[in-house]
Amino acid sequence: MPAASDKPVVTRFAPSPTGYLHIGGGRTALFNWLYARGRKGTFLLRIEDTDRERSTPEATDAILRGLTWLGLDWDGEVVSQFARKDRHAEVAREMLARGAAYKCFSTQEEIEAFREAARAEGRSTLFRSPWRDADPTSHPDAPFVIRMKAPRSGETVIEDEVQGTVRFQNETLDDMVVLRSDGTPTYMLAVVVDDHDMGVTHVIRGDDHLNNAARQTMVYEAMGWEVPVWAHIPLIHGPDGKKLSKRHGALGVEEYQAMGYPAAGMRNYLARLGWSHGDDEFFTSEQAMDWFDLGGIGRSPARLDFKKLESVCGQHIAVMEDAELMREIAAYLAAARKPALTDLQAERLEKGLYALKDRAKTFPELLEKARFALESRPIAADDAAAKALDPVSRGILRELTPMLQAASWSKQDLEAILTAFASEKGMGFGKLAAPLRTALAGRTVTPSVYDMMLVIGRDETIARLEDAAAA
């Protein structure tokens, strides 16, 4: 049988639908997606919904939306772990038949009494079932669980692509339950059965699952199945080095969409969070697929850095195709529950992207810079801009308007007219630009007056100048 690493790569992302898609989960999904896509492999999605009390359809929908926004497409249908419970129970019974598991009739009260006595005597509280080697003829007619018969001596060794060689002393591991008394499988069994049946070759997940790998390896070996390649990645910490929590900022992937970060920038940043390719900070998803490997993942927790996130996102906005940028802005507005752009606003915004997209790190920032293109007359000036509209400035705007009406409305012609007008009036261009910015945008900081005029067009420009002159 070929080693897992020699077979076509199959990875999976297997979240529990008990809440939103956490940013850490988004990064785990991304690493699995990149590893599979870069090797022409398969990326699968499984929803681990065996906890019926906490799992909700709404949480599943939120996970799917988060993955879709990130652009992480999966192969085939989404697998429900709960729907496979009969298969899990079948494997538990097969382990029983193989002698790799046994029926345990100990009650919860008996187990707790054992642990209390062990604590009182200073012994290990690791439960050792008296039913492990019991003669089946002595089994009572009573409820039972099925426990795996784990080795009690030696060690289980995990060769991890990130953590290196990790050794677990078998004497420290108990005989875990694989099937409950009500016939439902435990998570630890279900994960292994699903990964085996789905053909998963590489298990890439958070290092909080590292201890599980030892027990899960025992299940693989008990069933004679090939053990996958393990890669346990460090968790994400806050900027202060502590475990990521709400006080550090947004935790859910969808929150980042609603805050206006571009998906490509988010993918780039999350890929770089704990993985590196030399000194490269900015890269496309295609480059990440080519470059990504498990050896580039560090063992230390990565720290979330919002300044770096914004820097990377700004670079992605600057190079995005206009049509793609418009689609993402529309999706951002919907996610943030903000009004959609009107046809006129969208037309003006797309026309002005050339002057806007290299100046913004997020979509809200871009839209703020595009206010001149999105607002309707009359344009309300803020306090700073209003100071530029004194009686002299209004007179200048009245004189300038007829000259602009005759312009061809090219950038060259507009530059020539405004430069000549400023020269004729004996003023620097900045002196002329200030009232123009107020009239066109109501702000003191704007794109160039030429760009604003070109974006909103002749009629709107003249109407705004006339409004300001008459104010």
Curated annotation (Swiss-Prot):
GO annotation terms (biological process): glutamyl-tRNA aminoacylation
GO molecular function, one term: ATP binding
EC category name: ligase
Motif ('KMSKS' region): 243-247
Keywords: Aminoacyl-tRNA synthetase, ATP-binding, Cytoplasm, Ligase, Nucleotide-binding, Protein biosynthesis
Subcellular location: Cytoplasm
Keyword Iron: no
Residue span of motif 'HIGH' region: 15-25
Annotated family: Belongs to the class-I aminoacyl-tRNA synthetase family. Glutamate--tRNA ligase type 1 subfamily.
Binding partners and assembly: Monomer.
Name this protein carries in UniProt: Glutamate--tRNA ligase 1
Lineage start: Bacteria, Pseudomonadati, Pseudomonadota, Alphaproteobacteria, Rhodobacterales
